[in-house]
Swiss-Prot record:
UniProt KW keywords: Cytoplasm, Lipopolysaccharide biosynthesis, Nucleotidyltransferase, Transferase
Protein name: 3-deoxy-manno-octulosonate cytidylyltransferase
Pathway: Nucleotide-sugar biosynthesis; CMP-3-deoxy-D-manno-octulosonate biosynthesis; CMP-3-deoxy-D-manno-octulosonate from 3-deoxy-D-manno-octulosonate and CTP: step 1/1; Bacterial outer membrane biogenesis; lipopolysaccharide biosynthesis
Pfam families: CTP_transf_3
This enzyme's EC code(s): 2.7.7.38
Organism lineage: Bacteria, Bacillati, Cyanobacteriota, Cyanophyceae, Synechococcales
Organism annotation: Synechococcus elongatus (strain ATCC 33912 / PCC 7942 / FACHB-805) (Anacystis nidulans R2)
Subcellular location: Cytoplasm
GO cellular component: cytosol
GO MF, any single term: 3-deoxy-manno-octulosonate cytidylyltransferase activity
UniProt xrefs under CDD domains: CMP-KDO-Synthetase (cd02517)
Amino acid sequence: MVRILAVIPARYASERLPGKVLLPIAGRPMLQWVYEATIASNVFDQVAIATEDPRVVEAAAAFGAEAILTSADLASGTDRVAEASLHFPDCKVIANVQGDQPFVTPGLLQALVSPYRAGELPEMTTVGGPYDPAQDADDPNTVKVVCDQRGNALYFSRSAIPYPRTVVHDLPVYHHFGLYAFRRDFLAQYRQLPPTPLERCESLEQLRVLEQGYRIRVVPCADKVIEVNTADDLERANAWASQR
């Protein structure tokens, strides 16, 4: 069976919320929540953290995680994942588990790699969760994805897509959570692809894949996840953790 590696990119120099991966949620660094949830899912053969900052390496060691110190000037989290994956050559599928999703569920992680566990070898997979247009349509921090009839992504956007000119039920539109898995050979190929216009416009790295003519399989999952992008998100995460 194919071996699958999970890498958690943990960039300390976050623009919207600096140092957020080490900010406390109910007394533990956010990164520790992500790491422990990923380990507890029993989905992956190996789990590692990738960061540009020695402070994150030190914090990871304190809670028993393996952390890889990567280059500081990488263009994206996926580039950081790719660099870290070079330390694990026996893993043929590489998953990117976001460092700002402290309550990521086993269901989401299982969905992410389910095509590979079923013997398929798509270039890349991601997960689409429940989408509430009334709440999420105008929120640029909620990334939307629309899919074709075969479950492949047509487009990702921070805007509301599709435009509701006509009321249609059961549209293939999801809340995109930013989890990715790659075949190792495609991840290496991805790193060689130059940034693309739509990627730069939306600031969504996955658009590079679509613009270059490759496919991203979107696996639906009913689970939801809290993403921490702002101080308000962090406050909500702390409130949620205190109720667990």
